[in-house]
C-alpha cells in the first residue's frame, strides 16, 4: 500500500509540473500574439466549433418541423 501511495504521489507531482510548464508556454505564446489578426483567428477557432455544435443539434429539429416527417 505504501508503494502505491508513493507512486501516486510521484505521478501527481510530475503531472502538476507538466501542467505548470504547459501553462508557462501558453502564456509565452499569448504574449507573442500582439497583432489583431492573430487574436481574431483565436476567437474564430473558439466560436466556430460552438456554432457548429449548436447547428448540429437544432437543424434536425427545424427540418422535422418544416417537413413534418419526424
Swiss-Prot record:
GO-annotated cellular components: extracellular region
InterPro entries reported for this sequence: Antimicrobial_frog_1, Frog_antimicrobial_propeptide
Alphabetically ordered keywords of this record: Amphibian defense peptide, Antibiotic, Antimicrobial, Cleavage on pair of basic residues, Disulfide bond, Secreted, Signal
Organs and tissues of expression: Expressed by the skin glands.
Disulfide pattern: 64-70
Pfam families registered for this protein in UniProt: Antimicrobial_1, FSAP_sig_propep
Location in or out of the cell: Secreted
Main subcellular location: secreted
Signal peptide bounds: 1-22
Residue span(s) of the pro-peptide: 23-44
A GO biological process held by the record: defense response to Gram-negative bacterium
Function, in words: Antimicrobial peptide.
Family: Belongs to the frog skin active peptide (FSAP) family. Brevinin subfamily.
Name listed for the protein in its UniProt record: Brevinin-1Vb
